[in-house]
């Protein structure tokens, strides 16, 4: 019972303290306000012609990703085939050993 009274007093204290601070500018919005980027931020976000040659081109990147995906599928299929062949060979060897 003391725990419930303690919780009630804590919550009432928090409610009263938050109602007293409603005049503060910081308590109006916890997320803050949107501010426009300054000149330094705008300069950092602007395109730089010196870096343009390092920019990856969408078509070539898309092709490279596609080739990587195909190679991944081929490797996984090859591994699955190897496992299947080993299992079949083992099964045949056991069957041949039992029959002789």
UniProtKB/Swiss-Prot annotation:
<dbReference type="GO" id="GO:0005739">
    <property type="term" value="C:mitochondrion"/>
</dbReference>
<dbReference type="GO" id="GO:0006099">
    <property type="term" value="P:tricarboxylic acid cycle"/>
</dbReference>
<keyword id="KW-0809">Transit peptide</keyword>
<dbReference type="GO" id="GO:0045273">
    <property type="term" value="C:respiratory chain complex II (succinate dehydrogenase)"/>
</dbReference>
<dbReference type="GO" id="GO:0043495">
    <property type="term" value="F:protein-membrane adaptor activity"/>
</dbReference>
<keyword id="KW-0496">Mitochondrion</keyword>
<comment type="subunit">
    <text>Component of complex II composed of eight subunits in plants: four classical SDH subunits SDH1, SDH2, SDH3 and SDH4 (a flavoprotein (FP), an iron-sulfur protein (IP), and a cytochrome b composed of a large and a small subunit.), as well as four subunits unknown in mitochondria from bacteria and heterotrophic eukaryotes.</text>
</comment>
<dbReference type="GO" id="GO:0005743">
    <property type="term" value="C:mitochondrial inner membrane"/>
</dbReference>
<protein>
    <recommendedName>
        <fullName>Succinate dehydrogenase subunit 7B, mitochondrial</fullName>
    </recommendedName>
</protein>
<keyword id="KW-0472">Membrane</keyword>
<feature type="region of interest" description="Disordered">
    <location>
        <begin position="1"/>
        <end position="25"/>
    </location>
</feature>
<feature type="transit peptide" description="Mitochondrion">
    <location>
        <begin position="1"/>
        <end position="32"/>
    </location>
</feature>
<feature type="compositionally biased region" description="Low complexity">
    <location>
        <begin position="9"/>
        <end position="19"/>
    </location>
</feature>
<comment type="pathway">
    <text>Carbohydrate metabolism; tricarboxylic acid cycle.</text>
</comment>
<dbReference type="GO" id="GO:0009536">
    <property type="term" value="C:plastid"/>
</dbReference>
<keyword id="KW-0999">Mitochondrion inner membrane</keyword>
<keyword id="KW-0816">Tricarboxylic acid cycle</keyword>
<dbReference type="InterPro" id="IPR034573">
    <property type="entry name" value="SDH7"/>
</dbReference>
